[in-house]
């Protein structure tokens, strides 16, 4: 497999590199059990149990164990999903620290509690339904020897019903709040807030946007004729799937390009305290805001030299798909990395941010 980063959309060069072999990481269907219970007006307790006969190291990133205000559960009211106000983060998936994992012995359980009013708009009150589903990356071993992802554990929790007191829910402080945009400091490159940038950060971000636009445009052009690759990543080659892929990638390319003023605001540095350990960048989808974190600049190459490797360009592309002004409905984090993303169903893959980044990386 080759990585072909085609920059012809913006009149640049073509970079080609040989891909490294992708290790097998099987999806374990029912190794863990998750039970939800209500412990207050909007407080939820999740009990995670290892049903298997081997110890598990469960990666916390973008799962129900995540300590950051990411999407841990789905909340519905009258059949419609309640607005999510938290952050959608892209994490660095190499060099993982043991601190990022929760270890569960066979048949053991761990509890995680969180207030869904901190990451959802529940100010209307009334009856809601809460559930959780997804996959948790797993590693074998303990400590520093147990940080290499070797599999993925699928889960689907029970559903619980809550009758939310609107006044109490409104009194809960939102985890991410509202960002105050700086007037007079906007660069017409997807509205970069230059007041948050050093020159080196601005140069890196502009380069990432340039490459994001080129990769997205090249992938959009390739999708209708590269059906085997579309099927590999999106699990469908229907006309509707192809049209959705092309439309969304073209939208990302347009938003990333130099000549657009853009609908998103991009910050070079953290403005909402979302840059916790392991976070490369994050998006506030309800505000159409993207923020880069320090390790975006220090730990990522501008463009990857192998397939499925994280870089600045595809991280920016990934984050673009989280914004409702770019992709509607915006994409979520349903599967992370090649093995996890390609285990999704067609319906999930088309809504998964990393699927677009991975597809663009190899198109």
Swiss-Prot record:
Gene Ontology BP, a term: proteolysis
E.C. numbers: 3.4.24.39
Cofactor(s) essential for the protein: Zn(2+)
Summary of the function given for this chain in its UniProt record: Probable secreted metalloprotease that shows high activities on basic nuclear substrates such as histone and protamine. May be involved in virulence.
Enzyme's top EC category: hydrolase
Superkingdom assignment: Eukaryota
Keywords assigned by UniProt, alphabetized: Cleavage on pair of basic residues, Disulfide bond, Hydrolase, Metal-binding, Metalloprotease, Protease, Secreted, Signal, Virulence, Zinc, Zymogen
Annotated catalysed reactions: Preferential cleavage of bonds with hydrophobic residues in P1'. Also 3-Asn-|-Gln-4 and 8-Gly-|-Ser-9 bonds in insulin B chain
Transmembrane segments: none
Any one of the GO CC terms: extracellular region
Organism annotation: Arthroderma otae (strain ATCC MYA-4605 / CBS 113480) (Microsporum canis)
Pfam families to which the protein is assigned, alphabetical: Peptidase_M35 (PF02102)
Subcellular location: Secreted
Catalytic residues as annotated in Swiss-Prot or TrEMBL: 319
Propeptide section residues: 20-189
Binding positions for Zn(2+) per the UniProt entry: 318, 322, 333
GO function terms (MF aspect): metal ion binding; metalloendopeptidase activity
Family assignment from sequence similarity: Belongs to the peptidase M35 family.
Cofactor: binding details: Binds 1 zinc ion per subunit.
InterPro entries reported in the protein's UniProt record: Fungal_M35_metalloproteases (IPR050414), MetalloPept_cat_dom_sf (IPR024079), Peptidase_M35 (IPR001384)
Protein name, per record: Probable neutral protease 2 homolog MCYG_01991
Cysteine pairings via disulfide bonds: 197-268, 275-293
